[in-house]
Swiss-Prot record:
GO cellular component: cytoplasm
Gene: serS
Protein name per the record: Serine--tRNA ligase
Main location: cytoplasm
Compartments where found: Cytoplasm
Annotated catalysed reactions: tRNA(Ser) + L-serine + ATP = L-seryl-tRNA(Ser) + AMP + diphosphate + H(+); tRNA(Sec) + L-serine + ATP = L-seryl-tRNA(Sec) + AMP + diphosphate + H(+)
Function noted in UniProt: Catalyzes the attachment of serine to tRNA(Ser). Is also able to aminoacylate tRNA(Sec) with serine, to form the misacylated tRNA L-seryl-tRNA(Sec), which will be further converted into selenocysteinyl-tRNA(Sec).
Iron is among the record's keywords: no
Binding sites annotated in the UniProt record for ATP: R273, Q274, E275, E360, I361, S362, S363
A GO term for molecular function: catalytic activity, acting on a protein
HAMAP family for this protein: Ser_tRNA_synth_type1
The EC number(s) this enzyme carries: 6.1.1.11
Amino acid sequence: MLDIKYLRNNRDEANQRLIDRNVEDGVLDKLLADDEKRRSLIRKAEQLKAKRNQVSDQIGAAKRAKDNSAAQKAISDMQTVAGQIKDLDKQLSAIEESVHTQAAHLPNLADPRVPVGPDDSYNVEQRKWQPTDLQGRPAAFSKTPTWLKAHFEIGEDLGILDFQRGVKVSGARFLYYVGAGARLERAVYNFMLDEHRREGYTELLTPYMVTNESMYATGQFPKFVDDAYEVGKNQSMTMIPTAEVALVNWRRDEVLDESELPLYITALSPAFRQEAGAAGKDTRGLIRLHQFNKVEMVKFTKPEDSYNELEKMTVDAENILQKLELPYHVIRLSTGDMGFGSAMTYDLEVWFPTQDKYREISSVSNDEDFQARRGHIQYRDSKTGKLRFVHTLNGSGLAVGRTVAAILENYQNEDGTITIPEVLRPYFGEDKISKENAR
């Protein structure tokens, strides 16, 4: 949620920054016009309530003076004022709902350092990394080897990814991990969680269903309600699209102790997504599923520390890819490509040799006080004694299924086996996956 005072006091600047976020020109004008109506109604209501108090005093004085005529007139005036107040309250309730709805659909404003542009073609690469010794792996070849297979083909050949039965049981974009596939997925997320714990994150095991209020606090609702899986009576609960929702809401409606900040938390959870806008995209494989595992990182910080913490969180995500020795690059997203609640986002994209391109595997964002305002998450400043909104940061560390897919593609061998990355071997228990040990 944006600060309405900032929008009022910096109208032109705010309007341009919203246009940069692909908000239509005129949307802010409508919001501020309704906000002024709301404030005008509040002033009128306050004046009428003050008048009601005066009339109440007049009634009391007239009764004490036994002036029945004056008392009856004052009572009549009271009834008139009460009716006016009731009418104003109705108008005020309607305009407040309108203002709140409009404000809830406005995205966060981008940090000035974010590249301005309407789409992903304006994203800017920050850095690129690959292992120094690729040891004959696919990325080492200047030309794609003829034996190279897509991750879903490898998985099906080895019998470790079962898409056909996933579709039979649940429909499109579902699968079973089988044998070594399930063990590899488990090895990957246990490795990720251990790495984040070493970096100071506290691990949580969260609910997988949350209230609509929780989805509102993190910015998923109301704008993206069609992308969510709503469940329960009257659709009062939602399956989480990311552990970010449960992690941020862990401290919703709370005042944190300043000594707790920065607070680092992490969780593994399934993510449930409708993928409403993904028709025809990535119809095969692990890239785009309705249910997938993801390790999420969240931070609560003081405002002055949040961008330094954003850089640290990005490094924490990069650390996973570097230890897995997977080639990747980091891009800074443009104003038109960032998520709804973000003020700045870095995407980490890992190399997929069969696609000859990088694919997103992590998105790391600073939402500044956008979520904290919606979720009423504050801390008391020890110097001023005043309450301040925290800044919240979130990042994938990483999407587990996409990491498995990247490993299958980047560690495949000509004989059809998969070499297990060295850091995963203590978790997986073997150094290769072959047809002999796939189950």
